[in-house]
């Protein structure tokens, strides 16, 4: 099965400016992500960036680069520009890997592409089980709820489903008994290229603006998303300087 990976790489991160070029074990972070994507078996890997320095570095280590606008409001808008510019066929499977995931397991990159191919949907993703109560109540950990067949019912930063009997008068998070129903969404997506172009034609919705979760636009417009449990739990991504140091320590041991 053929699929294409697109890696958005913004230089102007608010919390860690220039992070695509941050050195990790002698390589820029974006190169680590690129190499993981290649290891997944993708037929094509494209780095999408709005920065000439990132583009030059990526070309030097052999990556295909697509320059994109600095004015996109979301990562999906950046993907749509790449799909249009490179005339990628509508039925091609596109996997979106964030440029700040240098430890992403190649096996789950392939898995999300296979997930999309197996089901009659235009979008697929992955999740992992939540085993920690603090993670469950952390709004930065996005929860996902599915039906019995893995089709998404909703994504939220809130606790879903809400255990009324246990949470109504909760005094100590550490005493929470977690059910198997609690899943954390992993921010890796597979789409058909034509669907990405459709997505950006839809207006932003109140749901996505409230939760700050752009995937809710898909559900609002009546499309289905299929989610599987990830075969491997991905390690930390890089959002802050502290995250960067953690990743450096992990890769220094390899």
UniProtKB/Swiss-Prot annotation:
Keywords: Cytoplasm, Lipopolysaccharide biosynthesis, Nucleotidyltransferase, Transferase. It comes from the Bacteria. One of its GO terms (biological process) is CMP-keto-3-deoxy-D-manno-octulosonic acid biosynthetic process. One of its GO terms (molecular function) is 3-deoxy-manno-octulosonate cytidylyltransferase activity. Its EC number is 2.7.7.38. The keyword Transferase applies. InterPro entries: Cytidylyl_trans (IPR003329), KdsB (IPR004528), Nucleotide-diphossugar_trans (IPR029044). Its main location: cytoplasm. Pathway: Nucleotide-sugar biosynthesis; CMP-3-deoxy-D-manno-octulosonate biosynthesis; CMP-3-deoxy-D-manno-octulosonate from 3-deoxy-D-manno-octulosonate and CTP: step 1/1; Bacterial outer membrane biogenesis; lipopolysaccharide biosynthesis. It catalyses: 3-deoxy-alpha-D-manno-oct-2-ulosonate + CTP = CMP-3-deoxy-beta-D-manno-octulosonate + diphosphate. GO terms for cellular component: cytosol. Pfam families: CTP_transf_3. It is found in: Cytoplasm. Activates KDO (a required 8-carbon sugar) for incorporation into bacterial lipopolysaccharide in Gram-negative bacteria. PANTHER family: 3-DEOXY-MANNO-OCTULOSONATE CYTIDYLYLTRANSFERASE (PTHR42866), 3-DEOXY-MANNO-OCTULOSONATE CYTIDYLYLTRANSFERASE, MITOCHONDRIAL (PTHR42866:SF2). Belongs to the KdsB family. This is 3-deoxy-manno-octulosonate cytidylyltransferase. It comes from Haemophilus influenzae (strain PittEE). The lineage of its organism: Bacteria, Pseudomonadati, Pseudomonadota, Gammaproteobacteria, Pasteurellales.
